[in-house]
Amino acid sequence: MEKENRGITLIALVITIIILLILAGISISALTNQGLFKNAKTAQKETEKAEAEQGQRLNEYEDEINKYLENEDENTKAFKEKVGKVLSTTDNTELKDAKNNKIVVPAGFKIINGATTVDKGIVIEDVTETATKGSQFVWIPVGTITKADGTSTTITLGRYDFNSTTGKESTYSGSFVEEDSNDSSTLKKYGNTIAKSITNFKNSVVQNGGYYIGRYEARTATARSAKDNALTQITEKGTENVYNYVTQLQAAELSQNMYTIDKFTSDLMNSYAWDTAIVFIQKCGTNNKYSRQNSLNTALLQTGTNSLTDTSKIDVQCNIYDMASNIEEWTTETSSFSSNPCVDRGGYYNRSGIYTSSRYPSLTSDSYDGIGFRPLLYL
């Protein structure tokens, strides 16, 4: 539930009311204390005294406002001082954004210029790993956050259904599952690849207040044209080619091996990560029904909608591109159909009837031009 935070506007309103009350008191006193003309000298002294007291109070209020503004500026300044710098190559670094929201930057990454608050989409970039250098990810905050406009909102990690009319989320009620390697009762063993550890993912999100998803559909330097193309290095660079013609098993392998250092974990998108990202976008982006958005492009874009000059066709929310557009994306979710166990999500350029929150069961062998994937990171 969203609510208004107290801020400068409230302070200004309080000051205005106090000043009006002071002036009203002065006027009443001057007019009613045994007659205006008879007590003119007394009234003048009282007025001068009241004006002095009023001036003192205004100075005090101004000091408080200045302190508030200075603190706000200091938060923004402190955050901006961290932008563009590798904070550590060996450890993850906890930061606060301009509104005092928590962010954790992985070892070897930097925050790039742009958003200074989490609701706008904080972007990090890999600057140390040779194979993946330049890859970008967006922080998905979980919990109660303060937005750039001073209001607050709450994003809860979960698997969701989305109302077809309003876009509002509710607890997922379908039969697809997110298998957990730590819980044998959830294992279907249908042949698709499941997440490394949903338990570890959820615990990390709680501890760190969020997770990262690829800014773009997975990319690769070499354009792909057939399902039997050799697997190549995965990146998250917006200038490279979409990684299509890939099976769910291949997408999981590439995502899970994207990073192998012990400070954070890479994996293929799971249903918690996908659905919670939609909730984040609907609460912080410009489309509160993004869950029902279908593809903005109607032909395959090899470098995604981020490369378009027609801005009306660019699918971007909170610095995240193409969850609703271009190609469908594999996840680690498992369908209820043993013959079609893989689940892909998101919009597809060739099908107007599917959208961001769509879930589709697919074969483990499915691989075509309109299917790709997106990696995630958690700490």
For each predicted feature, which ranges?
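Short, solvent-exposed loop/turn elements at domain surfaces
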Residues: 146-155, 220-225, 352-355
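C-terminal, surface-exposed recognition/capping segments
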Residues: 272-275, 303-379
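Short, glycine/small-hydrophobic-rich surface segments
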Residues: 60-83, 288-301
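GGW-centered surface loops in extracellular recognition modules
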Residues: 75-149, 266
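N-terminal single-pass transmembrane signal-anchor helix
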Residues: 6-31
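Aliphatic-rich helix starts adjacent to a transmembrane/signal segment
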Residues: 30-54
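Acidic glycine-/aspartate-rich tracts in secreted/extracellular proteins
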Residues: 28, 143-146, 217-220, 332-338, ...
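Short aromatic-cysteine micro-motif
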Residues: 126-134, 164-322, 379
